[in-house]
Curated annotation (Swiss-Prot):
Record organism: Thermotoga neapolitana (strain ATCC 49049 / DSM 4359 / NBRC 107923 / NS-E)
PANTHER family (alphabetical): UPF0102 PROTEIN YRAN
Pfam families: UPF0102
Family from the record: Belongs to the UPF0102 family.
CDD domains: PoNe_Nuclease
Protein name, as recorded: UPF0102 protein CTN_0433
GO molecular function: nucleic acid binding
Membrane spanning stretches: none
InterPro entries: Restrct_endonuc-II-like (IPR011335), tRNA_endonuc-like_dom_sf (IPR011856), UPF0102_YraN-like (IPR003509)
Amino acid sequence: MDWRAAEDLACDFLKKKGYRILERNYRTKYGEIDIIARCGKETVFVEVKSGRGKVDPLERIDMKKVRNIEKAAKLYMLQKGLKGPVRVDFVRVTPKGIDHFEGLWLG
């Protein structure tokens, strides 16, 4: 499965959980945020990882990636003039299904 299909599945999954998708593939100088959504009053920045092999796709997320997501999230909030709580979620898409890890990193 390619990254685009994984992100499409992740978006559909989040929408079914009541999330409102604001942006996809939002690019900044710090990198790209796969999905930006609203869940209640929170702005949620979602990193999507997919894979088929024996290595867990989440293992490809290191601290540098997390720091860059946090910087990109802060920049997004500033550029859009948004305030309020934020969080970073991770969605893992594999042939076995979709797993959603909420609030693994708070900005």
